[in-house]
């Protein structure tokens, strides 16, 4: 409105319109300098910020520690975190704040000089006790090949082929029933294979088991099969030599040793008669 009056002073009339008083504009008033001594311009009620010029703060210390840890792997920034005195907190209050800085450029270099038998990784030991197994096998084989003497001591030459055993292997006589009784008594596991080697069929073995095991035992079955072998064989086939050789080669040597005692007794009787 004041501008319109200045442009058209004759319309509104009056001396005031012709000679208006100078009025400061808003821009001139806002841009005028402010006197600090005036009470309205005092900033005492505002928040006073402490001057930090030239004084390192905790944030600057942490930034510097991060840079130092990235450049130096041996530098520990946690020492700076614990030693930094952050404003507004008590120094004796323990905090759980932690900071871990990891750098992909860090490398661990280990130098070894004059090292012998250097090993990395786990070590696994397996004890198989090979010596114990071998000694146990050796003792088992020794026990099988030796027969105890009357005084209880093992006899090393128990399974040795003696002169009497060689004579039995060369004998062409028909086995006596007393020899058959010794064989049926002392022939153990593997007796079926012995019967097969003597020429007995599976049917004959099964029939003997059915006929005689119900009324006796395996001893009776073996005895009846030996009798059947002698009766069904041709002349000169069922001999003491054939039976002794078969039992010796089949590792039934203990049975042969017991046959020898009976055979020597029979031969002695023949000589005396």
Swiss-Prot record:
Biased composition (Polar residues): 52-63, 134-144
Site (Cleavage): 30-31
Gene disruption phenotype: RNAi-mediated knockdown in the fat body results in reduced expression of the antimicrobial peptide gene Dpt following infection with E.coli.
Substitution effect: residue 30 to A: Loss of function. Abolishes caspase-mediated cleavage and ubiquitination. Blocks expression of Dpt in response to E.coli peptidoglycans (PGN)
Motif IAP-binding motif per record, residues: 31-34
Chain intervals for the UniProt region annotation (Essential for ubiquitination and the induction of Dpt): 143-177
Source organism, top-level taxon: Eukaryota
Pfam families per record: Death
Disordered: annotated span: 1-63, 134-159
Annotated region (May be required for interaction with Fadd), positions in chain: 132-178
Keywords: Immunity, Innate immunity, Ubl conjugation
Gene3D superfamilies per the UniProt record, alphabetical: Death Domain, Fas (1.10.533.10)
InterPro entries: DEATH-like_dom_sf (IPR011029), Death_dom (IPR000488)
MF terms (GO), sorted A to Z: death domain binding
CDD domains: Death
GO term, biological process aspect, one: positive regulation of innate immune response
Modifications made to the protein after synthesis: Phosphorylated. Caspase-mediated cleavage is required for activation and function; upon immune stimulation, peptidoglycans (PGN) induce proteolytic cleavage by caspases such as Dredd leading to its ubiquitination.
GO CC term (a single one): cytosol
The keyword Disulfide bond appears for this protein: no
Impact reported for residue 31 to V: In imd-1; immune response defective. Reduced survival and decreased induction of various antibacterial peptides after bacterial challenge
Protein name as annotated: Protein immune deficiency
Organism the protein comes from: Drosophila melanogaster (Fruit fly)
Gene name as annotated: imd
């Amino acid at each position: 409105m004041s501008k319109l009056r200045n442009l058209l002073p004759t319309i509104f009339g009056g001396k005031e319109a012709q000679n208006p008083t100078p009025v400061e504009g808003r821009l001139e008033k806002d841009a005028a300098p402010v006197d600090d001594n005036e009470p309205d311009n005092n900033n005492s009620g505002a928040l006073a910020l402490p001057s930090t010029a030239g004084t390192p703060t905790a944030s600057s210390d942490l930034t510097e520690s991060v840079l130092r840890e990235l450049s130096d792997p041996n530098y520990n920034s946690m020492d700076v975190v614990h030693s930094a005195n952050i404003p507004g907190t008590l120094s004796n209050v323990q905090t759980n704040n932690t900071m871990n800085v990891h750098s992909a450029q860090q490398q661990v270099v280990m130098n070894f000089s004059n090292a012998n038998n250097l090993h990395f990784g786990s070590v696994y030991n397996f004890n198989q006790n090979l010596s114990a197994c071998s000694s146990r096998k050796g003792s088992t084989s020794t026990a099988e090949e030796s027969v105890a003497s009357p005084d209880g001591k093992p006899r090393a030459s128990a399974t040795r082929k003696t002169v009497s055993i060689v004579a039995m292997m060369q004998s062409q006589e028909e086995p006596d029933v007393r020899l058959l009784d010794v064989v049926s008594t002392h022939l153990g596991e593997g007796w079926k294979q012995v019967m097969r080697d003597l020429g007995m069929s599976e049917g004959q073995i099964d029939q003997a088991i059915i006929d005689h095991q119900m009324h006796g035992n395996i001893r009776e079955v073996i005895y009846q099969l030996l009798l059947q072998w002698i009766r069904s064989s041709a002349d000169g086939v069922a001999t003491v030599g054939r039976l002794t050789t078969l039992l010796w080669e089949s590792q039934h040597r203990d049975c042969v040793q017991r046959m020898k005692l009976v055979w020597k007794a029979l031969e002695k009787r023949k000589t005396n008669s």
